[in-house]
């Protein structure tokens, strides 16, 4: 009778604490990985708290429930359909669609739509919990930001999720209620030396008492900058500028040039009022130990003749390291000198530790739109490997890794009626993922060209230039796996459509990708074998995330919908998972634990009877 009683008790415990044991075992398995993965964050394996999982932007989740062994069995949990919105008061119809990787935190999914809206959705059943919808008709400069309305990131900090709206106002929203608990309005107003316009698709970043933000505006003549504010007082702590003020600045960057790979150049950028660009885009990374902020800067404004901005144009198209407390430049590495091809870095910078010649080195990993991977020492900015080229041979690019031997007076007029490859959108546009000393990089195979036309720029009509994709030739996408220890290519695959803005992620030996046509791919990280592919027949413009609902059940969540880049339909949010009860090897582990518990209980009972 005692044995039967113990057996029943063990089965009851198994049933009651199954979910808890799932979590415990996942955490224990995660601990086993600590010595083997290149970067280990303190983030919960059940949450996806940042756009690329952690503040280092690795895009790697250590969960093991959804794995290479069962990803082929992914099943639909739920779909959330976003509503379309009305045109603005002045009949401007901005594009729709979603470019924001969803966040998953404590059983709630957070996502932003193109219209500056933030939604909180129950991860268990896809039911809406709350939404934040600012009145975008009240925004200033509607004719500017409405062309670039898409949100590209959210950030969770303490008890709030943060969004930066298109006109650069930052809101902190209570995670549970959606109430506004923090507001910092129009952070891109009154930027010194600026005579252009901005829009702001990226959420702020946090470090101690600092809120760090920036805005984009290369196409609208905005001056590149990064700002830090005191979270308590909301006062500006520092500005850092990546380009000189409109009209130029004598000896711009002359003294700071020694901190990077470019020699000082007199009269860099020249002295025209058209000067602009180098705005920081993509995700930034933070190293708390050295208190360093790592970021990427975009190309110089290319709406006017590049010959009017002579020089390397520091600090555009660069990897940049700043002292996070003061905004002081620590080092920079310029990828594309005097950039006229828009060969600036892709979606994000990654901070990680890699092993090179059996020595661990802190490294910054970034890729350019020209299909080069840069592996840079995080402390010094020096190259660990020479720039690593991947993909097809480039065609007709200017100043391709030529640094100080670049043509400092080149003009984009050479591309009028001609093509160059990769295009101004890449190559690499979407974000890579880094896991266990390997970088997984998405690229699109498409060429670009330049047209001349009159356009409005900085409040006047100029004879300017616009960049366009060459879609008369076949296009497709590729994914490359590069060993960061050796710089060697491990494998590559080609898929039918381009990977334009959906970042890659890695988890449990599976690489996840979504192409423009809306095909969801699960790929074996060892050899590039496609383990699963699911067509959704709608624009894929944002990457997936992996996290758990309130019961601890793991799921993959991703948005779909849009047209070209942002799109013309509001989109959906998709949740998929595997049947943990039948597919997961945890059941065998749990049974083993139950059996051990039963044996232990029997032994204890015998000892008590004997005593």
Where would I find each of the regions flagged by the language model?
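Sec-dependent signal peptide cleavage junction
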Residues: 35-43
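Juxtamembrane/start-of-transmembrane alpha-helix segments at the extracytoplasmic/lumenal side
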Residues: 580-592
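Repeat-blade elements of multi-bladed beta-propeller folds
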Residues: 47-55, 93-117, 143-170, 196-225, ...
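Aromatic (tryptophan-biased) beta-strands that constitute blades/sheets of beta-rich domains
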Residues: 43-93, 127-143, 179-188, 235-274, ...
